[in-house]
């Protein structure tokens, strides 16, 4: 039996350090730790793909948390089945569960379904909040870019920089920068 590790964060700005440290504490060799810095909703992850190629029957894959392996219940079930068909067990360190045995597989399936439901609830609440804010007039996203042609046109008509700034709802310094360019 060989131990392998898998760690994932959703973005390249996040750190894998905590997960890798936990895997090493379980005696997983650094050369057997596979990582990804992409969303768990992406099924074709490079680190996961490499892990699938390396493991053999009797091996065990350690993952710090259930949601690090995947986000979607159907994808998680498919991954677990794929590893199970290869004779490879998955153990989730923080959750204290394993795919070894029928009960372990059932628990993992239920927990991944609960995790997915929670994510959907969070998305729902976020969207409701966004719609409510929008109804109250809250603006989202970047401010519109400055229409430089309009700044030059108004300036050509003899309108002051302060008045141009008011009309176009931009800073006076922005007007000066456009005129200087």
Swiss-Prot record:
Gene3D superfamilies linked: 6.10.250.10, Homeodomain-like, Resolvase, N-terminal catalytic domain
Disulfide bonds, paired cysteine numbers: none
Alphabetic keyword roster: DNA integration, DNA recombination, DNA-binding, Plasmid
GO molecular function annotation: DNA binding; DNA strand exchange activity
Positions annotated as active site in the UniProt record: 10
SMART domains, per the entry: Resolvase
Keyword DNA-binding: yes
CDD domains in the cross-refs: SR_ResInv
BP-aspect Gene Ontology terms: DNA integration
Keyword DNA-binding appears in the UniProt entry: yes
Annotated DNA-binding residue span(s): 161-180
One Pfam family cited in the UniProt record for this chain: HTH_7
Top-level lineage group: Bacteria
InterPro entries, A to Z: Homeodomain-like_sf, Recombinase_CS, Resolv_N, Resolvase-like_N_sf, Resolvase_HTH_dom, SSR_resolvase
Domain Resolvase/invertase-type recombinase catalytic positions: 2-137
Family classification: Belongs to the site-specific recombinase resolvase family.
Functional note: Site-specific recombination protein.
Protein name: Resolvase/recombinase
Organism: Pseudomonas putida (Arthrobacter siderocapsulatus)
Lineage: Bacteria, Pseudomonadati, Pseudomonadota, Gammaproteobacteria, Pseudomonadales
């Amino acid at each position: 039996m060989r131990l392998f590790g898998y760690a994932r964060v959703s973005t390249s700005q996040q750190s894998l350090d905590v997960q890798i440290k936990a895997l090493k504490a379980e005696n997983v060799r650094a050369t057997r730790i596979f990582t990804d810095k992409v969303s768990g909703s992406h099924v074709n992850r490079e680190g996961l793909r490499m892990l699938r190629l390396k493991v053999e029957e009797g091996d065990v894959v350690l993952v710090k948390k259930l949601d690090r392996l995947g986000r979607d219940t159907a994808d998680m079930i498919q991954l677990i089945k794929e590893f199970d068909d290869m004779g490879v067990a998955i153990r989730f360190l923080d959750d204290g569960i394993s795919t070894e045995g029928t009960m372990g597989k059932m628990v993992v399936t239920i927990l991944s379904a609960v995790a997915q439901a929670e994510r959907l609830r969070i998305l729902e609440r976020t969207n409701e909040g966004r719609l409510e804010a929008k109804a109250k007039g809250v603006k989202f996203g970047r401010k519109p870019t400055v229409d430089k042609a309009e700044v030059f046109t108004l300036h050509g008509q003899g309108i002051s920089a302060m008045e141009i700034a008011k009309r176009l709802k931009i800073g006076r310094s922005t007007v000066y920068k456009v005129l200087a360019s």
